[in-house]
């Protein structure tokens, strides 16, 4: 993992643990080698739920439902979560976990490929969490940004996974297509045009 250890220590110091259900779900997921977010991302998500209090959340990549349940549990505001999962074996497990946690009314699971589902969604989201196939993030980005409410938050897990970074050429190509993907460059261009 590529993270400053001081940052990890700080983020983890904010965390006071999980509910008993989430602790058990995390333990089972790790034992079954199901990929779920690391502790520091769990702490960060909990912090963001309290700070941003999003009412509509989109999650791309459900697995067994751990992250969706964590966001639902630690958001102090009532929220609706739509989560997308493509792996058929995990879908019934996630649905069962939502039911066991009593959150099936707040969390809706859409079954299928996010590349096909995202274009069908129309209502904006306050918060979007991408935790799917990392190689697809750039392909999802145009639709994800279309769905992100103005002032909303986009969080993508494992951008620096195991030392691999988003392909800079692919990112540059996206910036050429739409400068808003590279906000800092677009702002710089506007300033230089004003002079």
What spans do the regions from the language model cover?
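A short alpha-helical cap/connector motif
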Residues: 1-127, 134-155, 159-195
